[in-house]
Every structure is written in structure tokens, then in C-alpha cells.
Amino acid sequence: MKDFAIIYDLDQTILPAAAVPEETFLPIYEAIRSANQGTVPDEELEEALKKIRTVSMDVIAKEHNFSDAMKEAAKEAFLNRDYKFSCSPFDDWPVVKRIPGKRFLVTSGIPKLQQAKFDALFEEGDFDGIYVDNIYDENRLGKKRLFEKIAEEQGLIPDLIWIVGDNPDSEITAGNELGMKTVQIVRPGIEQSDKASYLICSFYELNDLVTKWEASLKFKA
């Protein structure tokens, strides 16, 4: 049988957003508040800051019309510091290691911050490849291009690649546009979408889904 791959998102898929200590983000909050200068109403700004744990900074800035000064303050605050903390994944993370197929991780964000999460969560060999979609990279590829890159490097057609994540407007949309199988994992607080090919609430369900699909391929072969 041919190889196949599963590409996982990180935040709100493997790692609860609340698992990263709040103090990690305090300097970022303060930098953005200081640069605001009345551009965004205080109440709206506080709502925007609450999203930093779960939503990419570039998306937040666009949605709430951050000024250039606010964007630059956020960028400097994110980039000019080191990160180290302890955090724990969702309880069903160990199930991922039992699910058939090659495993890849693709996550958007700040490389140093995402690396701190990797260091706290993963062991060597947990994934066949890890990719960070760096939101501040001038030559940013984006998740869609990274998915294509993995497919090309692994010699896999889209139908043999699964995309698993929580965000229907990010990894799910990218996977759909490439003709890959998409699975939205609906963690607590995540709104269910009709964009994905499949809906699950845990990796136990993903294991059942992929195992049955793999068995059907073997049967056809």
C-alpha cells in the first residue's frame, strides 16, 4: 500500500491555548497598549488582546485595524525576547502516536514562541517533519504552500494527505483548496464549521476514522 500522511495543526488542536502561561504574553499586551494612542477603543483592544493565545497576530491586527505603530510594537515585543515555559497538551495527545501514517506538524506564528511549545511538548521522533509558518517572514509561504511542499517532498497525491486542525479559515480552507482530506477537531470553545470533510472531537475519533480508511485501501488493493 502507498504511504499517506497526516498534517496536524498545533494550537487548539494538540495544545490548549490556555496551557501557555499568561505571563508569556504580558510584555506583548503592554507594548500594543502603549502604541495604541487611541487608534482602537480600549474595550475593543482588550478583546483583541484576549485572542493572541488562539489567533495569529497578523489576523488580529487586520480584524481590529491596528495602526502601523501597533503592528510594529507587537512585532518587536514578540521577536525581541526568549521563551521558555512548561505546558501540557490535550489528554488525547498520546493517541496521535498510534494513528497510522506519516506525521507532520504545520503551525503559524512566531518561530521562537512555537519552538518553546515544541520543547515543552514533544520528543524526538514524534513527527516526521515540523514546519512553522512565520507570520513575520517577508517570504512567508503560508499553510497552503507548506502543505504543497510536504506533498511534493513525500511524493504524495492530495487524496493521500489528511489535514487536521481547528480553524476552518486557515488549515481547513488550505487543505480543501488542494483537494486534501480535511478534519476539523472541535475542541471546547471551538465553533463547528461545515467546511471540513469530517468533524471530530478527539484524536480517538481520528484514530478510528483513519484506521477504517486505511483498511478500505488495503481491501481495494
Predicted regions, residues:
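Asp-based, Mg2+/Mn2+-dependent phosphohydrolase catalytic module
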Residues: 1-4, 104, 110-221
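Alpha-helix C-terminal capping segments
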Residues: 45-49, 61, 92-102, 121, ...
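Short histidine/acidic/glycine/proline-rich micro-motifs that form metal-
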Residues: 12-16, 46-47, 135-137
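Short, acidic loop-to-helix structural element flanking the phosphoryl-transfer center
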Residues: 80-105, 144
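A metal-dependent, Asp-based hydrolase signature
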Residues: 33-34, 46-81
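An amphipathic alpha-helix signature
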Residues: 21-30, 53-58, 111, 115
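Short catalytic-loop micro-motif centered on adjacent basic/acidic residues
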Residues: 15, 44, 105-106, 163
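Active-site neighborhood of HAD-like aspartate-dependent phosphohydrolases
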Residues: 1-42
